[in-house]
Amino acid sequence: MNHYPECTCQESLCETVRGFSAHHPDSVIYQTSLMSALLSGVYEGSTTIADLLTHGDFGLGTFNELDGELIAFSSEVYQLRADGSARKARADQKTPFAVMTWFRPQYRKTFDHPVSRQQLHDVIDQQIPSDNLFCALHIDGHFRHAHTRTVPRQTPPYRAMTDVLDDQPVFRFNQRKGTLVGFRTPQHMQGLNVAGYHEHFITDDRQGGGHLLDYQLDSGVLTFGEIHKLMIDLPADSAFLQADLHPDNLDAAIRAVEN
């Protein structure tokens, strides 16, 4: 039987519940390529969706040619497209950048009142205060609003991602049930991944979603856990090998494209 000790969290949001995984093996984050490569326009990879699912049942990323956002949970992968729609991804589709794990949450918190994105993050940060660890988080619930963007499909010659997002479509899903998948990445990993919180959303009918810019949860269940291990597959193609992976404006550029 799992033991669920109580803890106190800021502004009585609390009783974050220690959960599920005292006896589970350590989770590992699997990542294909680098965020800095995506930022510089490396939009084609050789890793398939089928490959990703051998490394985890939960994650996020994008698709070749930057054709929308990727969200994965319960071993199902969806493509969140530039028109705001969503569809199930094919096993043979490929990704230039994705992050996956076997989701083994350690904590659970039920919300029966509205909370902001920042308040949700505060719950996680208080329970796992060290910024030197990865966290994976999942929410199933009713969202008062979910403000998203997606990236439009690109064609060669590829522009840098900061230029692509000048054309990004944005959407607002109001009063919708849905699923959030996200990671909190340490600041020292900026460039390898996206430092801070990176979250994707899909509606419960699996017909729409995107990369989250902001949201408010009316009610739902948050599960999350810390991850201590990271494995990265680096591409060997010429686009990656010739890319500038550490430009002077790396941190500012990533913050601009993600937020």
Swiss-Prot record:
Keyword tRNA processing: no
Keyword hit for Cell wall biogenesis/degradation: no
Assigned EC number: 4.1.1.5
GO biological process, one term: acetoin biosynthetic process
GO molecular function: acetolactate decarboxylase activity
Keyword annotations: Acetoin biosynthesis, Decarboxylase, Lyase
Official protein name in the record: Alpha-acetolactate decarboxylase
Protein's organism: Raoultella terrigena (Klebsiella terrigena)
